[in-house]
A protein has these predicted regions:
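Active-site recognition of the HExxH zinc-binding catalytic motif
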Residues: 47-56
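Metalloprotease/metallohydrolase-associated module, dominated by Zn2+-dependent proteases
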Residues: 1-44, 59-98
Length: 98
């Protein structure tokens, strides 16, 4: 599965590949590519997606800042019962995009 966020700068793309050799759950690249290990599931998946997106949106932020913000956002969204469900019903976002 590939996810494209078009209104972000740079365009953020998420791809899944095994990251065992890198000893990472996720990697953010400066060109907007995020790689996530497909073994990451559930709440940890949410945390890693948020964490890597924050790295791209705020490249000047320290690892500690990114970690703190991603954990906070994950806890809030999880408490609000955000869950990844496939297939997804596409309802437009506030800007009209899917």
């Amino acid at each position: 599965m590939k996810l494209l966020l078009r209104n972000s700068k740079p365009k953020i793309r998420i791809k899944y590949r095994k990251l065992g050799k890198e000893k990472a759950w996720g990697i953010a690249h400066s060109d907007g590519l995020i790689e996530i290990d497909p073994s990451v599931k559930s709440k940890k998946h949410l945390e890693i997606v948020i964490h890597e997106v924050l790295h791209i949106l705020f490249p000047e932020a320290s690892e500690a800042e990114i970690e703190n913000k991603s954990i906070t956002l994950t806890k809030i969204l999880w408490a609000e019962h955000y869950r990844r469900i496939e297939p997804e019903v596409h309802q437009p976002l506030q800007d009209g995009t899917k």
